[in-house]
UniProtKB/Swiss-Prot annotation:
Entry keyword set: Metal-binding, Pyrimidine biosynthesis, Zinc
Lineage: Bacteria, Pseudomonadati, Pseudomonadota, Gammaproteobacteria, Enterobacterales
UniProt keyword Nucleotidyltransferase, yes or no: no
Residues that bind Zn(2+): C109, C114, C138, C141
Details of cofactor binding: Binds 1 zinc ion per subunit.
Name of protein: Aspartate carbamoyltransferase regulatory chain
A GO molecular-function descriptor: metal ion binding
Family membership: Belongs to the PyrI family.
């Protein structure tokens, strides 16, 4: 909210609000998670001012609720995100993404020789953490990649 208490992005009656998305990541989330494959209204705020982050993106999807699996898959791209469930214009639930053990159907294997790049199979990566480092291991070629390598693809 701004200092004059006006919303910069219109409130929704019922649905999901993904807040505290790093700036410039909102569109990527819409695409990767196929959030636009709905006939429901989607409101996007890009480069909004944020006290914590400087700038942030925001996504509001009416009449749609994310599964726990979807929320947790957001952790790769937006680990500080907050996912709010809205009902009758009120926040009725909040959750924070945490890295899942596997990420399915979202990422593309960066190995150009991987079968998943040419065959119609769903992508699947095991998530491995070593301290703060996140490695992703492709189910098909069994190669491990640093998080930033997979996300750049």
């Amino acid at each position: 909210m701004t200092h004059d208490n006006k919303l910069q992005v219109e409130a929704i009656r019922r649905g999901t609000v993904i807040d505290h998305i790093p700036a410039q990541v909102g569109f990527k989330l819409l695409s990767l998670f196929k959030l636009t494959e709905t006939d429901q209204r989607i409101t996007i705020g890009l480069n909004l001012p944020s006290g914590e982050m400087g700038r942030k993106d925001l996504i509001k999807i009416e009449n749609t609720f994310l599964t726990d699996e979807q929320v947790n898959q957001l952790a790769l791209y937006a680990p500080q995100a907050t996912v709010n469930r809205i009902d009758d214009y009120e926040v009725v639930g909040k959750s924070k993404p945490s890295l899942p053990d596997r990420i399915e159907n979202v990422l593309v294997c960066p190995n150009g020789n991987c079968i998943s790049r040419i065959e119609p199979v769903s992508s699947s990566f095991a998530v491995k953490t070593r301290g703060d480092a996140v490695q992703l291991k492709c189910k098909y070629c069994e190669k491990e990649f640093a998080r930033h390598v997979v996300l750049a693809d």
